[in-house]
Curated annotation (Swiss-Prot):
Source organism per UniProt: Methanosarcina mazei (strain ATCC BAA-159 / DSM 3647 / Goe1 / Go1 / JCM 11833 / OCM 88) (Methanosarcina frisia)
EC class (word): oxidoreductase
One GO molecular-function entry: metal ion binding
Subunit annotation: Composed of a large subunit (VhtA), a small subunit (VhtG) and a cytochrome subunit (VhtC).
Listed GO biological process terms: methanogenesis; respiratory electron transport chain
Entry keyword annotation includes Oxidoreductase: yes
Keywords per UniProt: Cell membrane, Electron transport, Heme, Iron, Membrane, Metal-binding, Methanogenesis, Oxidoreductase, Transmembrane, Transmembrane helix, Transport
Family to which this protein belongs: Belongs to the HupC/HyaC/HydC family.
Topological relation to the membrane, as annotated: Multi-pass membrane protein
Gene: vhtC
Co-factor requirement: heme b
Enzymatic reactions: methanophenazine + H2 = dihydromethanophenazine
Enzyme Commission number: 1.12.98.3
Protein name, as recorded: F420 non-reducing hydrogenase II cytochrome subunit
């Protein structure tokens, strides 16, 4: 992470170029898949079935490559050594006690009690973020991973009933496993997979609404859109949602970071 030398600002790299590529491709591919998938299912008239299916199949490898190759690379390229990488993964992507405390604070703030806690924590000493994600996103991410796996597995069968990989009858294996579950719901194996595929589509729509329409509907969060899609930078002097951990006895707690920047600095007591 790099910061500039202007004492009035503290600009650091929040997202690398590969982070931005991954997020942009993921967003575009997901939107294309949702729209074309619902067109195929519902029969909307704004494009032909052939066009929708073609666009759908083009977007699939992009989504899978980003989520199963590029994003894991981005995650585990951080940290030094095996334990450092594991520590980075846990701190940044696993919902823990500190995230629970932040989430409770966010819920209280929603009901007008208390301030909105900082969910971005930057360590000035190490020059790295301790955590960047909204606590609710740390809950949604593993659920998204599961949903992506299920929609891929069901999609293989919907694409081709006898699809195979290197001679292995993958689609038939999936149908066989589905056949163990489907009778419980009074469905055929393929019918169950079709419903599962549709339900996962609705999940991704729900996640999109939560991610964009609720968590980040606050204009003060829009700075992160510019960072994730374009600049990759964050100015930590903008204290909304941000805490800077300083290696000195005057480290400001979250409540102090929410002061009006025009106010005079108050004395921080240990």
């Amino acid at each position: 992470m790099k910061s500039n030398n202007n004492p009035k600002t503290m600009v650091v790299e929040r997202y690398t170029i590969t982070d931005r590529i991954a997020h942009t491709v993921h967003a575009i591919a997901m939107i294309v898949l949702i729209i074309t998938g619902l067109k195929i299912y519902a029969g909307w008239e704004f494009m032909s079935f052939h066009t929708a299916r073609t666009l759908h199949m083009i977007a699939v490898p992009f989504l899978l490559a980003v989520n199963w190759i590029l994003i894991p690379y981005n995650i585990f390229s951080e940290g030094h050594g095996l334990m450092g990488k594991i520590s980075h993964f846990v701190d940044h992507y696993i919902f823990g006690p500190k995230d629970l405390a932040r989430l409770v604070g966010i819920i209280k703030n929603f009901f007008g009690k208390g301030e909105y806690p900082a969910f971005t924590v930057y360590d000035e000493k190490t020059g790295h973020y301790k955590t960047k994600l909204h606590p609710l996103m740390k809950i949604l991410i593993p659920l998204e991973g599961l949903a992506l796996f299920l929609i891929t597995v069901s999609g293989i069968v919907l694409y081709k009933l006898d699809w195979s990989l290197f001679g292995l009858p993958v689609a038939q294996w999936i149908i066989s496993i589905s056949g163990m579950i489907a009778p419980t719901f009074g469905m055929t194996p393929v019918g169950f997979l079709r419903v599962l595929h549709l339900l996962m589509t609705y999940w991704f729509i729900f996640e999109l609404v939560v991610h964009v329409g609720i968590l980040e509907f606050d204009p003060r969060v829009w700075k992160y859109y510019k960072a994730i899609f374009w600049s990759g930078k964050e100015d930590l002097s903008d204290r909304h949602f941000v805490e800077v951990a300083r290696n000195n006895p005057n480290h400001l707690p979250d409540r102090e970071l929410w002061r009006d920047p025009s106010d005079k600095p108050s004395e921080v007591k240990e």
